[in-house]
């Protein structure tokens, strides 16, 4: 069939939908709005309102917007085939949306409409759409059925392994449908022929009635017609017989037509029954496929278990004479169990000790955090006291420097006096002539006795200077200890003063922030109050606010009812989740049993190998094929286990996807209900309500700012402490 005719037939099929967008011609369908609306009617669960909202309604002559809409429609249809229907279109040429958007290409439009037709005949409401197709014209119906057949031939299931029996049943049902369709066409043709015959007979009947009327007139005119001896009478009798025969034949034809109409209705009912049976057969085919797969898996597992049982029997026969080995095995098992229990107890004790240590460490960490906070406070105090002590130390050092300078000056004066004393003594000795005796008595001025020839004033002054010199030396030696004690006292004073100043500073900052918040609140209240003329407006606003609050309470009550309905539905979901959890636990338990059996088999196999090697070393060469066969069986079992694990992972992924879909559906439903409640609230509310809520938000913002400002210093200190 020509692609143009196919496109026209599909456009006629699309006209069976009740669409708001224009959809009479290819140009009307070029923007993709009508097709997206039809997809929303075909599968509203998949093509939702949010998806339809992405379609640009005002594309007009802008071919780029039309191309964007058509791309969204094409990707949505392909995703529906792969995700919902589980089919992949292999050899079907996808439509070129660019040529449709630019040139309104009829061939590409026909391909796109053919894909939408496939979605319609495979969706949940496919029976309704098939009935609509059966009610169309014969040529259009034939073209649409050919398009469906072409699309079904190029579809392939996403999961391989479709049974040939199912395909055979599908072909049989398709052949039955074709036969029923042909029988329907024959019956329709027969009904048409009967209608034509009835119409002809009705025309003949009308003619005969006219002729009868004429003859009756003639009979009335001529009474001699009733006489059979005359030709007119014989003609009259013959015509009356013909009229009676024609009436009987018309009655018979009408009854036949009614019978054929009833048969046609019965055939249509049979067609519907066959379509339902076809769906049931498809479902049964899928179930049989799953059951056959399970039977194959169970058959393979049964064969492998029988092989394993045979091998176990052979090993049992070989191990009947090895009682000592069994005893040792049992002893080893008991010992391993005892060791495992001991290890488990040790681990439990270690875990308890570690838990107690962890609790102790947590307490220590908390104590250390407290100590760190105290130490930070002490450090701040110590810093302030250190500053004060450094200032005091500077003053003490200056005082020390002054004393050192004074000491140096006193030393110089002492040396000068000593020199003067020596000069005076020498002069006196020279004058008396006792040079040798006096020269032997002259010694160091500090440690020697003062000569008797020195005058008493100078002697007193020298003694006083020596005493002062000794005192200065002792004071210089003890100044370090005194400085340390003084600096420690100054440091304590500085620390105490620093703590006091910090607390005062924080209290002052908090008081300043509180006063700022109060000032802002007073300013906002003054701005809200304004002039006395606004009091009336505030009263009206309060009344409106009360009305809106009542409406808001009604909306909240409705929302609460909807939430209760959702809460009533949630136990069903929780019960299904519990069932899934139980099945998962059973599956995990079976996996653990399989792993334990596999480990036990391996252990028995290794022990048997070691026993065979120790008992009969000559048969090691002959037993290698058996060992190889056992290895092959183990590899097959490992492959089976890997296959089961992959199936388990797939089932787990599908279950997680189902849970995500359920959760997303619940969230979407809750969001829609919340959105409806908010929209109803906004529709019932007015502009005054928005203004009032804005003022309320401003008050809340100022109050929050006040609370944050009051709590900020402590919070900042805690953040610094954590860092």
From Swiss-Prot:
Domain of life: Eukaryota
Keyword Transport applies: yes
Recorded GO CC terms: centrosome; cytoplasm; microtubule
Coiled coil feature spans: 162-423, 457-665
Keywords, alphabetical: Coiled coil, Cytoplasm, Cytoskeleton, Microtubule, Protein transport, Transport
Subcellular location(s) of the protein: Cytoplasm, Cytoskeleton
Comp. bias intervals (Low complexity): 696-711
Entry keyword Protein transport: yes
Main localization (coarse): cytoplasm
Cross-referenced SUPFAM superfamilies: Hook domain (SSF116907)
GO biological process: cytoplasmic microtubule organization; cytoskeleton-dependent intracellular transport; protein transport
Chain segments carrying region Disordered: 682-723
Family statement drawn from the similarity comment of this UniProt entry: Belongs to the hook family.
Complex formation: Interacts with microtubules.
The name this protein goes by in its record: Protein Hook homolog
Lineage of origin: Eukaryota, Metazoa, Chordata, Cephalochordata, Leptocardii
């Amino acid at each position: 069939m020509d692609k143009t005719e196919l496109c026209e037939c599909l456009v006629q099929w699309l006209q069976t939908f009740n669409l708001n967008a224009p959809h009479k011609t290819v140009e009307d369908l070029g923007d993709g709005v009508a097709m997206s609306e039809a997809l929303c009617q075909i599968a509203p669960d998949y093509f939702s309102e949010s998806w339809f909202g992405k379609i640009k309604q005002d594309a007009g002559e802008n071919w780029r917007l039309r191309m964007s809409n058509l791309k969204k429609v094409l990707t949505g249809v392909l995703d529906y085939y792969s995700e919902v229907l589980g089919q992949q279109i292999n050899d079907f040429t996808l439509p070129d949306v660019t040529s449709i958007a630019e040139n309104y290409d009829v061939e590409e439009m026909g391909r796109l409409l053919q894909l939408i037709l496939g979605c319609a005949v495979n969706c949940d409401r496919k029976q309704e759409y098939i009935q609509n197709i059966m009610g169309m014209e014969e040529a259009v119906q034939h073209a649409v059925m050919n398009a469906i057949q072409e699309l079904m031939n190029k579809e392939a299931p996403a999961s391989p392994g479709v049974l040939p029996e199912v395909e055979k049943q599908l072909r049989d049902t398709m052949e039955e449908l074709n036969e029923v369709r042909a029988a329907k066409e024959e019956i329709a043709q027969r009904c048409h022929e009967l209608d034509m015959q009835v119409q002809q007979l009705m025309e003949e009947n009308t003619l005969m009635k006219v002729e009868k009327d004429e003859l009756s007139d003639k009979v009335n005119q001529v009474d001699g017609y009733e006489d059979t001896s005359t030709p007119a009478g014989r003609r009259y009798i013959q015509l009356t017989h013909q009229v009676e025969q024609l009436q009987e034949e018309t009655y018979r034809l009408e009854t036949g037509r009614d019978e054929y109409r009833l048969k046609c209705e019965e055939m249509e009912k049979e067609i519907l029954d066959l379509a339902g049976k076809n769906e049931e057969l498809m479902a049964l085919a899928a179930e049989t496929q799953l059951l056959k797969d399970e039977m194959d898996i169970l058959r393979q597992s049964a064969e492998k278990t029988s092989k394993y049982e045979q091998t176990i029997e052979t090993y049992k026969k070989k191990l009947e004479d090895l009682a000592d080995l069994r005893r040792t095995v049992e002893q080893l098992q008991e010992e391993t169990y005892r060791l495992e229990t001991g290890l488990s107890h040790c681990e439990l004790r270690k875990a308890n000790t570690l838990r107690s240590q962890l609790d102790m460490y947590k307490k220590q960490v908390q104590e250390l955090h407290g100590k760190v906070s105290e130490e930070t406070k002490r450090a701040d105090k110590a810093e302030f006291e250190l500053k004060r002590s450094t200032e005091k130390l500077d003053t003490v050092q200056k005082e020390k420097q002054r004393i050192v300078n004074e000491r140096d000056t006193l030393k110089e004066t002492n040396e000068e006096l000593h020199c003067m004393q020596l000069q005076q003594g020498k002069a006196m000795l020279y004058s008396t002539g006792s040079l040798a005796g006096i020269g032997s008595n002259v010694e160091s001025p500090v440690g020697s006795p003062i000569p008797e020839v020195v005058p008493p004033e100078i002697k007193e002054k020298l003694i006083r200077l020596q005493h002062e010199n000794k005192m200065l030396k002792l004071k210089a030696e003890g100044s370090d200890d005194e400085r340390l004690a003084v600096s420690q006292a100054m440091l304590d004073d500085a620390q105490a003063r620093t703590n006091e100043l910090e607390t005062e500073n924080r209290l002052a900052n908090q008081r300043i922030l509180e006063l700022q918040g109060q000032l802002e609140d007073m300013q906002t209240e003054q701005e809200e109050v304004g002039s006395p003329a606004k009091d009336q407006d505030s009263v009206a606003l309060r009344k409106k606010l009360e009305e809106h609050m009542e409406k808001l309470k009604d909306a909240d009550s409705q929302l609460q009812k909807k939430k209760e309905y959702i809460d009533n539905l949630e136990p069903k979901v929780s019960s299904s989740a519990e069932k899934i959890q139980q099945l998962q636990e059973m599956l995990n338990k079976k996996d653990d049993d399989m792993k334990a059996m596999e480990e036990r088999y391996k252990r028995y196999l290794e022990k048997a190998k070691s026993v065979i090697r120790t008992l009969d070393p000559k048969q090691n060469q002959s037993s290698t094929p058996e060992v190889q066969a056992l290895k092959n069986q183990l590899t097959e079992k490992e492959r089976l286990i890997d296959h089961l694990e992959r199936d388990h992972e797939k089932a787990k992924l599908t279950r997680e996807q189902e849970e995500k879909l359920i959760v997303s559906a619940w969230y979407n439903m809750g969001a829609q209900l919340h959105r409806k409640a908010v929209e109803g609230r906004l529709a019932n509310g007015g502009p005054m309500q928005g203004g009032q809520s804005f003022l309320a938000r401003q008050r809340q913002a100022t109050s929050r700012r006040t609370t944050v400002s009051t709590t900020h210093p402590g919070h900042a200190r805690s953040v610094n402490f954590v860092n």
